[in-house]
Amino acid sequence: MYQIVLASGSPRRKEILSQVGINFTVCVSNMEEITSETLPENIVMELSKMKAHDIAKQYETNTIIIGSDTIVAYKNQILGKPKNEDHAKEMLQLLSGVTHEVYTGVTVIIKNDSGEVEERTFFEISKVTVSDLTEEEIMDYIKSKEPMDKAGAYAVQGRFAAHVTRIEGDYYTIVGLPIARLYQEVKKFGIDLVKQM
């Protein structure tokens, strides 16, 4: 039996794991998220790896550590979490009326009962199309405070859903954890994540 550890404080990621019946604990990595990578897929994979490795040091055996990172990209611009309300407004104006990509990288570190380590890192990409946003809609959304801790300054599963006209790819990638891919990747090691209770 493995202890499953989510190396993230994200309420969305916690919700996804709980939703499918996975029993897990949360151990938040406080490391600074700095990378020299420039491609969105490499950024999210490297940051997910850094988070997972940071937390993995605290566990010896029988543990599955899951690190994840999500960013939004549009025309080679990387959009992380907004620094302030003005920054959120800039991001939302940029995404208004266009299709952008959401990248989520995941690293899974598995430490078995003899302390041997297996590791897998992958990423998923989904596309999101946003309707044309008025200035008033942007300001109302920012006033809700919802955008402030979200990559790209929006939550597809929250109030912003009213402005999302199309999604291509996995919805959970956009929320922050591609659960079906995660399940399949861990299954390759002969482990059923849902049965680890």
From Swiss-Prot:
Q: Which residues does the UniProt site feature Important for substrate specificity point to?
A: 12, 70, 157
Listed GO MF terms: dTTP diphosphatase activity; UTP diphosphatase activity
Cysteine disulfide partners in this protein: none
Q: Which UniProt keywords apply?
A: Cytoplasm, Hydrolase, Nucleotide metabolism
Q: Which NCBIfam families match?
A: maf (TIGR00172)
Task: Kindly give the HAMAP family that the UniProt entry links to this protein.
Answer: Maf
- From the Swiss-Prot or TrEMBL record, give the protein name: dTTP/UTP pyrophosphatase
